[in-house]
Amino acid sequence: MDAERIRAYLLTLPHVVDTVQWSGTLVFWVGDKAIGGKMFAMVRLEQDESLERDEKRRVISYSAGPERYHELLEREGIFPAPYAARIFYVAVRSWDVFRKTEWEQELSAAHALTFAKLPEKVRAALALPAAQQKRLIAERRKVLAAKAAAKAR
């Protein structure tokens, strides 16, 4: 697996949206962030060469959930995700830690865990027809942009 294949797979899951944030991290959300979607996986697009020998180097971090978290940490190449371990995220050092089917199972489980935690209001928005959902997201982004502009003044 690699970042491109992971992205292609994740975008086939229901309601998945991706954004690039934090200088070179591809973030996957269940539902658009503008309507309250929640993040479930983060893929490092660029590996800083200074991190090559760093023990905290990672290619992906994702939500493992409290049941699977400790089990995954026993596997070589997996460690608590920096800044997100308290919410049961794990980080993986390289793509060869799992086979393709295992990656798909792990990330599908992360998606399902996150979807289950979405508030009812967000789930209702995700159940709307695509065109209506798109309008809602555009309206919400306008509101958020106006709030940000007012705050900047």
Q: Residue ranges of each PLM-predicted region?
A:
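Charge-dense, helix-prone N-terminal extensions
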Residues: 1-153
